[in-house]
Amino acid sequence: MAISTLTLTQSLYTRSFRPTIFFSSSSSSSFSCLCSSSSDCEPKLSVKKRVFGVGLGFLASSILSLTPLDADATRIDYYATVGDPLCEYSYAKSGLGFCDLDVGFGDEAPRGVLVNIHYTARFADGTLFDSSYKRARPLTMRIGVGKVIRGLDQGILGGEGVPPMRVGGKRKLQIPPKLAYGPEPAGCFSGDCNIPGNATLLYDINFVEIYPGSNTR
């Protein structure tokens, strides 16, 4: 996976990295050699070695110059496509399934405040259909006032046997159709709909923060 490149050390690049360089045979400056004997190819091979050395130098410098921002971008791409670990759901009377991976360390969100969350959203078969990580910023939403689907409100704010989330918490939600978009398709544009009717939705929620300066209303 792309994430694994973040753990490589400089020694690995210099000792075990073996790049493959391809030379086009269609170019007039091609290094392809069609000859009847090895001696006819020696001058071209020496040129190839010099070019290979220069190319390897550029390649090594570009790899070793991986910045923290590059690493963050790779992590964002990783979390946009890979879900949190599996856990066993508990179920509220409403039918909402919930499971805490991390209870969190901060405050609970009062009804009506703005909160920032990161999330990935999947269908019941595991197919990803939305993720805040792909946009590289959390979603800002007003909690508990009907601005989002009922399953998200209840899953974050709590109620009916669901404990409220705390800042820093990570929770998995299994949202039945009646707490999501119901029997009608959703996310439709020009006749194409992202979410079919009667879809059960799976959310991985990361409660980032209560929006600074947010007030209930």
UniProtKB/Swiss-Prot annotation:
GO cellular component: chloroplast; chloroplast thylakoid lumen; chloroplast thylakoid membrane; plasma membrane; thylakoid
Localisation: Plastid, Chloroplast thylakoid lumen
Disulfide bonds: 87-99, 188-193
Pfam families associated with the record: FKBP_C
Limits of the PPIase FKBP-type domain: 112-211
Top enzyme class: isomerase
EC number: 5.2.1.8
Plastid recorded as keyword: yes
Principal place of residence: plastid
PROSITE patterns: FKBP_PPIASE
Annotated organelle transit peptide span: 1-34
Domain of life: Eukaryota
Catalytic activity of the protein: [protein]-peptidylproline (omega=180) = [protein]-peptidylproline (omega=0)
Subunit-structure text: Part of the chloroplast NDH complex, composed of a mixture of chloroplast and nucleus encoded subunits. Component of the NDH lumenal subcomplex, at least composed of PnsL1, PnsL2, PnsL3, PnsL4 and PnsL5.
Family statement: Belongs to the FKBP-type PPIase family.
Role: NDH shuttles electrons from NAD(P)H:plastoquinone, via FMN and iron-sulfur (Fe-S) centers, to quinones in the photosynthetic chain and possibly in a chloroplast respiratory chain. The immediate electron acceptor for the enzyme in this species is believed to be plastoquinone. Couples the redox reaction to proton translocation, and thus conserves the redox energy in a proton gradient. PPIases accelerate the folding of proteins. It catalyzes the cis-trans isomerization of proline imidic peptide bonds in oligopeptides. Seems to be essential for stabilizing the NDH subcomplex A.
Protein's UniProt name: Photosynthetic NDH subunit of lumenal location 4, chloroplastic
